[in-house]
Amino acid sequence: MKKIKKETKLVLTGRKPFDNYGIVNPPIYRASTILFKNTKELRKAITNRFNQTYYGRYGTPTTFALEEGIAEIENGYRTIATSSGMSSISITLLSFLSKDD
């Protein structure tokens, strides 16, 4: 498999034009409330919260595209975009520290 140059990754990553009617850049979704047909669908979305929108503060297709792009560029497994610097610091510390640290 041919290695993709960094410049190409920067241009292509996080974009799925054929999922968006051929439009290159993903649309900007601004949402706080997400509706579901029933509670079963809501529960399903909550268990898959990092891949599906269930509450606007936890991600929209726009933030998912950003997270995918950053992970791809950094050769990481996954990225989580947060709403503030304090929340990103907290997530980082809570991921690596135990209660007696």
Name every feature range the model reports, one short phrase each.
Residues 95-101:
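Conserved PLP-anchoring active-site segment centered on the Schiff-base-forming lysine
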Residues 1-29:
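Short conserved active-site loop signatures built around small residues
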Residues 18, 35-39:
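Short, acidic Gly/Pro/Ser/Thr-rich loop/turn segments
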Residues 27-32, 44:
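A short glycine-rich, His/Asp/Glu-containing loop-to-beta-strand
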Residues 15, 30-34, 57-59:
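Pocket-edge structural micro-motifs
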Residues 38-87:
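Conserved N-terminal alpha-helix of the aminotransferase class I/II PLP-enzyme fold
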Residues 9, 27-28, 78-80, 101:
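Structural motif
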